[in-house]
Design a protein with these regions (language model features):
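Bacterial N-terminal signal peptides
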Residues: 19-30
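Short, Lys/Arg-enriched N-terminal segments with co-localized hydrophobic residues
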Residues: 1-8
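Carbohydrate-active catalytic/glycan-binding domains of CAZyme proteins
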Residues: 31-384
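Bacterial N-terminal signal peptides that target proteins for export
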Residues: 9-19
Length: 384
């Protein structure tokens, strides 16, 4: 028996040594003769230049085209995406002549985040109260379209926040509509916040969160005129908890009265137990880019990765998206104003527009996966 055991051990050792020798040879061969990486062509089935489909009667073929300031939520097994009234080569007269059901706030849906169908428009017209406020306080200007919608569910009701403004002014109106369906019809519920040239803030770009830790509701909004603000909402109504409350400052930047800052998007990461505030810097048609801060509470204070408070008069980092171009492609500008969605499995996605260079007039939806690094900061995938 001892001799047999010895022979078995001897064979085992020899086999191990032979295996290690073969492994070493394999390593030497692989190191001495590396295989060159050969990329597999993966042509884009959709043309980035959609000029040929830009006529109003082609609206059912737009898919990811003509998307600006997107907000996305998954409802059941369907993703719904709402976006600003921004259409390349828009012509309301042609739309009317060809019976295009042109309205306000584009609504799309998808099963896979790749193939999108344009459902239509949320509203048949701009709410009269918003039009009256803006034009009365902006010398008859503005209120020609609806910007930056945001969708959130409360019990069995969907709440759609939106803004109406006069471009380049602080005269703006954030309104609320509700529906039993994400596709409408929508019932107007009134004004959340409205501003004019006398107020320090600008009532545009709403983003709303229900704090999962406290049940309180908060809306983040604003732009470069006075910065970004956070105001508490009444969960029962979706409007401000206190009448005529504008909230408190949460973000601005260096040269904040001149350099662009807008488009807050607030989310909660339950794994990190942090609230992330995504914001957009710079002109929307050129160097538009997304940055981010984080906080322990949805109302702030929000700090960047260097520990700077976003409401200080500094420029904050990191930068998550910016204009770029890959070889063989004209590139993208205006890659900002994002919406963010968290899947039940913990995966995160960012949605934003990109403007096709060099004219920067064609607007296409970009969807990227978000990853959080070891230090708890988000980064986004290079693929769209």
């Amino acid at each position: 028996f001892p001799q047999r055991l010895f022979m078995d051990m001897k064979r085992l050792i020899i086999n191990r040594l032979v295996g290690l020798g073969l492994l070493a040879v394999g390593i030497l061969v692989s190191c001495s003769a590396p295989t060159a990486f050969v990329p597999v062509p993966s042509p884009n089935p959709w043309a980035d230049d959609y000029t040929a489909l830009s006529s109003m009667e082609n609206y059912k073929q737009w898919g990811t085209y003509n998307v600006h300031d997107p907000a996305c939520k998954k409802i059941g097994d369907t993703y719904y995406l709402y976006s600003t009234d921004a259409i390349f080569a828009e012509n309301k007269e042609v739309a009317k002549q060809k019976n295009v059901p042109l309205g306000y706030i584009q609504v799309r849906k998808s099963k896979d985040l790749v193939n999108w169908d344009l459902v239509g428009w949320a509203f048949p017209e701009i709410p009269a109260e918003a039009v009256n406020w803006v034009r009365t306080h902006a010398e008859g200007q503005g209120a020609t379209n609806i910007w930056a919608p945001y969708i959130i569910k409360h019990n069995d009701v969907y709440r759609l926040y939106y803004c109406v403004s006069a471009f380049g002014k602080k005269t703006s109106y954030i309104g609320l509509a509700e529906s039993a369906s994400p596709e409408g019809p929508w019932i107007q519920k009134g004004c959340v916040v409205k501003t004019d040239e006398q107020t320090p803030m600008n009532a545009i770009d709403p983003s709303v969160i229900e704090d999962p830790q406290t049940g309180r509701w908060w809306m983040h909004y604003g732009s470069y005129f006075g910065g970004l603000f956070c105001v508490e909402l009444n969960p029962a109504t979706g409007l401000t908890r206190q009448k005529n409350d504008y909230g408190h400052l949460i973000a601005r930047r260096a040269n904040y009265k001149k350099d662009n800052l807008e488009a807050p998007e607030i989310i909660f990461n339950p794994e990190l137990k942090k609230y992330f505030l995504f914001v957009s810097y710079d002109p929307l048609m050129t160097t538009y880019n997304v940055r981010v801060g984080r906080a322990d509470k949805p109302e702030g204070p929000f700090l960047d990765y260097a520990g700077h408070d976003l409401k200080d008069t500094t420029n904050n980092f990191p930068i998550l998206t910016a204009p770029y171009a890959f070889e063989g492609h004209p590139g993208w500008a205006g890659t900002a104003h994002c919406g963010v969605w968290r899947e039940e499995n913990g995966r995160y996605y960012m949605f934003h527009q990109g403007r096709l260079s060099p004219e920067n007039q064609l607007m296409v939806l970009h969807t990227r996966e978000i990853f959080f690094n070891a230090e708890g900061w988000p980064v986004v995938s290079p693929e769209r």
